[in-house]
Amino acid sequence: MAPSQRQIEEREARKQRILDGALNVFKANGIEGATMDHIAQESGFGKATLYYYFKSKEDVFSEILEAGWKNIWESLEPIIADQGSPRNSFIKLLIKIAEIAQARPGLFEFLFNAPKTIKLENQPWKEYQHR
């Protein structure tokens, strides 16, 4: 039996709560100092719930970066695709970036301050940095 829409929304809400808690932990401790215990405590879940959604703290870290960059890029794509003047497009891009930064300043700061030398096997968020 397929999950109901309500169940899907609840799972997504739990996952987002984990990511929000993890963001606080990573900002405070870095990836090296963060643990799944810290993330569980900050997000208000048990470790088993975290491991249901993520294999490791590196996976949580990667998900925050990938989702954050994806959100930024998807917000900017329509402006880039617009056929307006370069000057107006540039101004619209700056305004949109400022809006994103104001809406989630902690995430925005994290995305731009996350160490660039992270040695994770898979770094899917980098795709958004190089577009």
Model regions and ranges:
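Short coil/turn segments at alpha/beta junctions that flank glycine-rich nucleotide-binding fingerprints
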Residues: A28-E32, Q83, R104
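Short hydrophobic/aromatic patch on the recognition helix
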Residues: G44-F54
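Residue-level detection of the helix-turn-helix DNA-binding "recognition helix"
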Residues: Q41, K55-S56, E66
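Amphipathic alpha-helical segments used for helix-helix packing
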Residues: A101-Q123
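Hydrophobic alpha-helical connector segments
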Residues: E63, E77-A103
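Amphipathic alpha-helical packing segments from all-alpha helical-bundle domains
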Residues: K70-W73, E77, E121-R131
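Basic, helix-initiating cap at the start of DNA-binding domains
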Residues: M1-N29, G33-E42, D59
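Alpha-helical DNA-contacting segments of helix-turn-helix folds
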Residues: F61-G68
